[in-house]
């Protein structure tokens, strides 16, 4: 590390919508500052997971320290990369809290999108210096002036310092580096000498345990210090080493001082011990007050995960345990289903988080899994005054005991070209949405503000929005309050037996159509047996939809050649009695594909 000067440190973040070129610009910055040699360079260098590269998204926040010579001075530039997706908004807010400035990357052809809007507002709340950057300026469809106007009018940013760049060709990259040095303020000199450091991420390393990523606000942290976490008020730990991101995590001598970004190791074994947003201080000279803004991360969406082959249960348990080491937001609880066997009830930050975990389980651990339909946390107010929070249909109490139910709602911002307005309005109406306001973003695009039940968002809202806007619509959401709703438990009965894997909590208005579609799907995927199988959807024991799988025909009179009809009748009667007995005592074997197909549909 170069000699320490707080006035020569710049901590900044990059805000962008998915696919607007954030990771590519980060790559060009690393190249221009010679942080990484050309031969070691690869696409999306900071996105370390294959999944991040394939999907073109950032899942984990990745910091990196660069040095840059400007007007005879050496500057330390700390890029604290943030996830762009709405599921990880708390991580984004903590990463932004570690910065003094941010680059707002906007695609010069597509313009401002919903998720960049959400993160810009987070940055404005923290009073960060925002530098607008128009990327992909080399595209024939680029409209720099129109998009500058959008940024000015809708976000309210001064665009006089806007930089036109192309991460692909490298145009504009030196200007970005100079703007960071000129416009982003250095960290404020600390008012106190006690150590205060903000935890903005952590990473599990199999050799050294948890690496805690910090931005030092005041004081310094060095090897041998005894530290503690202020918000969680847990045990104390000895710092075994400190390091910087160059761009790989590299141990170093000396200390991390006010304004600097780095990490420390302290023999921590569980990610749960380290909470994002917490404040690190020393035991000997503790800080008086922790940093503001700490929140416990709580899961929003829940789903059951079961191995298709029950002998893989222990492997699945191990896989989830390993994923949890690097993902404190993932919650795991063991559960048992009559139909699916032993599995886990998992909590996620949102639908993208859930998809990523599923994909990593099948990819990194080579496991075939079944996942139940995602559900949210409902509030059940009982007649005796008690309140329950449930995320699983099996926990639904007796309807006679329920006073009312409440469901979580969200505030949604949708950005869309004008021609798709009526499509979106009918989609939101179908999803029980309430329109709050409509604003013009520019001559061609609108911003629609809606309130929607979270349950309607987690099922298929994103797919349907992309479908009705031909891929041009984007949205982001933030959690609102609970509201009363007519939520009921829909049960699916196969041969008069309820199958818990198919039961779900739905709004009363949607129950009949959902029940009918599940029954119709099951008729197609369950093979016929030797007896008729009724498939029914029921609410509170009342059947609301029914389909029947016809029995396989078996010709019992095949051996009768001619002769008296009474002989055939006897055989038919005997077969009828046998089928009746089979229906009473026969078990319907439901293939795994049936579960997969129905859950895919949900």
UniProtKB/Swiss-Prot annotation:
Which Gene Ontology terms of cellular component type are present?
Answer: plasma membrane
Q: How does it sit in the membrane?
A: Peripheral membrane protein
Q: Cellular location of this protein?
A: Cell inner membrane
Report the main location listed first in the record: membrane
A GO molecular-function descriptor: ribosome binding
Q: Record's PROSITE patterns?
A: G_TR_2 (PS51722)
Has keyword GTP-binding? yes
* A Pfam short name: GTP_EFTU
Residue sites binding GTP per the record: 19-24, 135-138
Please give the start and end residues of each transmembrane region: none
Q: What is its EC number?
A: 3.6.5.n1
Which positions fall inside the tr-type G domain? 7-188
**Which Gene Ontology biological process is one annotated for this entry?**
positive regulation of translation
Q: Which UniProt keywords apply?
A: Cell inner membrane, Cell membrane, GTP-binding, Hydrolase, Membrane, Nucleotide-binding, Protein biosynthesis
Among InterPro entries, the record links this protein to: EF-4, EFG_III/V, EFG_V-like, EFTu-like_2, LepA_C_sf, LepA_CTD, LepA_IV, P-loop_NTPase
Q: Which domain of life is it from?
A: Bacteria
Q: What reactions does this protein catalyze?
A: GTP + H2O = GDP + phosphate + H(+)
| HAMAP family, sorted | LepA
Question: Which PANTHER family did the record assign?
Answer: TRANSLATION FACTOR GUF1 HOMOLOG, CHLOROPLASTIC, TRANSLATION FACTOR GUF1-RELATED
**Which family would the database say this protein is a member of?**
Belongs to the TRAFAC class translation factor GTPase superfamily. Classic translation factor GTPase family. LepA subfamily.
Q: Which purpose does this protein serve, as stated in its record?
A: Required for accurate and efficient protein synthesis under certain stress conditions. May act as a fidelity factor of the translation reaction, by catalyzing a one-codon backward translocation of tRNAs on improperly translocated ribosomes. Back-translocation proceeds from a post-translocation (POST) complex to a pre-translocation (PRE) complex, thus giving elongation factor G a second chance to translocate the tRNAs correctly. Binds to ribosomes in a GTP-dependent manner.
Quote the protein name from its UniProt record. Answer: Elongation factor 4
What species is this protein from? Chlamydia trachomatis serovar D (strain ATCC VR-885 / DSM 19411 / UW-3/Cx)
């Amino acid at each position: 590390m170069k000699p320490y000067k707080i006035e020569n440190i710049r901590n900044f973040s990059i805000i962008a919508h998915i696919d607007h070129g954030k990771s590519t610009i980060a790559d060009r910055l690393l190249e221009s500052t010679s942080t990484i040699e050309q031969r070691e360079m690869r696409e999306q260098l900071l996105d370390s997971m294959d999944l991040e590269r394939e999907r073109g998204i950032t899942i984990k926040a990745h910091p990196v320290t660069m040095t840059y010579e400007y007007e005879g001075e050496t500057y330390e530039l700390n890029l604290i990369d943030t996830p762009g997706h709405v599921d990880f908004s708390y991580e984004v807010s903590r990463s932004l809290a570690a910065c003094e400035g941010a680059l707002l990357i906007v695609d010069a052809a597509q313009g401002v999108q919903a998720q960049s809007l959400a993160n810009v507002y987070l940055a404005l709340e923290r009073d960060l210096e925002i530098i607008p950057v128009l990327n992909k300026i080399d595209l024939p469809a680029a409209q720099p002036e129109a998009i500058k106007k959008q940024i000015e009018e809708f976000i309210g940013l001064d665009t006089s310092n806007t930089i036109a760049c192309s991460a692909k060709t490298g145009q504009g990259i030196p200007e970005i580096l100079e703007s960071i040095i000129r416009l982003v303020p250095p960290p404020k000199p600390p008012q106190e000498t006690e150590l205060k450091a903000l935890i903005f991420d952590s990473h599990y390393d199999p050799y050294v345990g948890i690496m805690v990523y910090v931005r030092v606000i005041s004081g310094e942290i060095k090897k041998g210090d005894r530290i503690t976490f202020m918000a969680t008020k847990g045990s104390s730990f000895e710092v075994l080493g400190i390091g910087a991101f160059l761009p790989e995590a590299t141990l170093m001598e000396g200390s991390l001082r006010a304004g600097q970004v780095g990490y420390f190791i302290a023999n921590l074994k569980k990610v749960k011990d380290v909470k994002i947003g917490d404040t690190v201080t020393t035991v000997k000279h503790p800080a008086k007050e922790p940093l503001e803004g700490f929140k416990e991360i709580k899961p929003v969406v829940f789903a059951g995960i079961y191995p298709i082959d029950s002998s893989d249960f222990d492997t699945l348990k191990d896989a989830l345990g390993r994923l949890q080491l690097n993902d404190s937001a993932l919650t795991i609880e063991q559960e048992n289903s009559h139909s699916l066997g032993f599995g886990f009830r998992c909590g996620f930050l949102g639908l993208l988080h859930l998809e990523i975990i599923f994909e990593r389980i099948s990819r990194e651990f080579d496991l075939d899994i079944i996942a139940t339909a995602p559900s949210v946390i409902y509030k059940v107010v009982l007649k005796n005054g008690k309140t329950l929070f449930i995320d699983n249909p099996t926990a639904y109490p007796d309807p006679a005991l329920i006073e009312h139910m409440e469901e979580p709602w969200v505030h949604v911002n949708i950005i869309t070209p004008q021609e798709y307005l009526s499509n979106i309005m009918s989609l939101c109406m179908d999803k029980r949405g309430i329109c709050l306001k409509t604003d013009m973003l520019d001559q061609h695009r609108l911003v629609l503000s809606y309130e929607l039940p979270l349950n309607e968002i987690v099922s298929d809202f994103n797919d349907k929005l992309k479908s009705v806007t031909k891929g041009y619509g984007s949205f982001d959401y933030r959690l609102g309050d609970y509201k009363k709703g007519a939520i009921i438990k829909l049960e699916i009965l196969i041969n008069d037996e309820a199958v818990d894997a198919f039961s779900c909590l739905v709004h009363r208005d949607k129950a009949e159509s959902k029940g009918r579609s599940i029954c119709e799907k099951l008729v197609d995927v369950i093979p016929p047996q030797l007896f008729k199988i009724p498939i029914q959807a029921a609410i509170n024991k009342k059947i609301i939809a029914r389909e029947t799988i016809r029995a396989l025909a078996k010709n019992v009179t095949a051996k009768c050649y001619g002769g008296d009809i009474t002989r055939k009748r006897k055989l038919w009667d005997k077969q009828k009695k046998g089928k009746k007995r089979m229906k009473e005592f026969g078990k319907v074997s439901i293939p795994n594909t049936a579960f997969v197909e129905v859950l895919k549909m949900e």
